[in-house]
């Protein structure tokens, strides 16, 4: 989409050489389109106040460990409040018998999870995101930029996505390929 224009009774959307009009307009830009979406909102005088970002890791473990949950409810939502800072930690995007895949968004490599109905594509692992929401107060306004900078620094430190074994994490050391 090149431009979104507010009309007296609806919207006009410009996409390449085409133009579309409608009484209502729903735009879903996703995380990679968040900067563009912020600009669209500014152009249309739409107030935004997204001053939160989810920071986390993707956890992969043998499927049997969570099978008591995933056999009953495909995508379990687990929430935990930490005792020290009272942060809410939550699971998101659970993929029973799924795989972890790399994604490149604007030059930043992150991971996501997929799972498949086809048994031939299923793995022996389950994966999910473990997230903490970070809320910012004024005057800071660029929560998406904050999250992006953490991902970019992680890529710099690890030469790509950082992979960490749980045992090494507990011992306070980096995991090695061996």
Regions from the PLM with identified roles:
Residues 1-178:
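Residues forming the flavin
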């Amino acid at each position: 989409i090149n431009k979104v224009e507010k009309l007296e009774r609806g919207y006009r959307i410009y996409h390449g050489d085409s133009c579309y009009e409608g009484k209502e307009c729903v735009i879903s830009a996703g995380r990679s389109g968040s900067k563009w979406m912020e600009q669209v909102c500014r152009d249309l005088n739409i107030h935004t106040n997204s001053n939160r970002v989810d920071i986390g890791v993707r956890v992969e473990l043998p499927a049997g460990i969570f099978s008591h949950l995933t056999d009953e409810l495909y995508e379990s939502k687990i929430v935990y409040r930490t005792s020290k800072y009272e942060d809410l930690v939550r699971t998101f995007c659970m993929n029973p018998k799924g795989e972890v895949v790399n994604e490149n968004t604007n030059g930043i490599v992150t991971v996501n999870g997929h799972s498949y109905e086809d048994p031939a594509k299923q793995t022996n692992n389950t994966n999910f995101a473990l997230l903490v929401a970070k809320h910012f107060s004024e005057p800071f306004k660029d929560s998406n930029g904050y999250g992006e900078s953490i991902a970019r620094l992680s890529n710099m430190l690890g030469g790509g996505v950082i992979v960490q074994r749980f045992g090494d994490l507990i011992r306070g050391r980096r995991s090695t390929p061996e």
